[in-house]
A protein has these predicted regions:
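Basic, polyanion-binding surface patches
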Residues: 1-141
Length: 141
């Protein structure tokens, strides 16, 4: 789950393609479809938090963040969120989180591959495994 705040705008997306990209500095890559509204909030210099969900606790946030929301509706209303050192959102169900800053963007067909440097992170639940979301098809979201 990629969560972000930019001024008063908060957003979330389920990231299917996340990968470690570098050791020094620590970095990751995320693929974002060009037609996603969140893409405009992941420009060079923008920050975000990658919330890594637990296999035990991923179903509720998955339901919450994949349902349609009205424009401007707060997806986090009623949630007991915390903030990273860069003031990005951590949800209560997170197993771990990474606070990152976008450094590069590469155009790849109908997606952007975003490279971000990891600035901070923490493991919140060391007794659980990472959730894996299996899609019925990789042809669309």
């Amino acid at each position: 789950r990629v969560l972000f705040r930019s001024n008063n705008i908060k957003g979330a997306m389920l990231a299917s393609w996340v990968s470690q990209a570098s050791f020094s500095p620590p970095g990751l890559s995320i693929a974002v479809a060009k037609d996603r509204s969140v893409e405009s909030l992941l420009q060079i210099g923008d920050s975000f938090a990658l919330n890594i969900l637990s296999e035990k606790d991923f179903k509720e946030p998955l339901k919450r963040f994949t349902k349609p929301f009205a424009p401007g509706e707060d997806r986090f209303q009623g949630m007991d969120i915390e903030l990273t050192p860069n003031e990005q959102i951590i949800i209560p169900e997170a197993l771990a989180w990474l606070d990152a800053s976008v450094k590069e963007r590469m155009e790849c067909g109908d997606h952007w591959v975003i490279y971000a440097e990891v600035l901070h992170g923490n493991i919140l639940k060391s007794d659980s495994l990472t959730a894996v979301h299996h899609r019925k098809t990789g042809a669309n979201y």
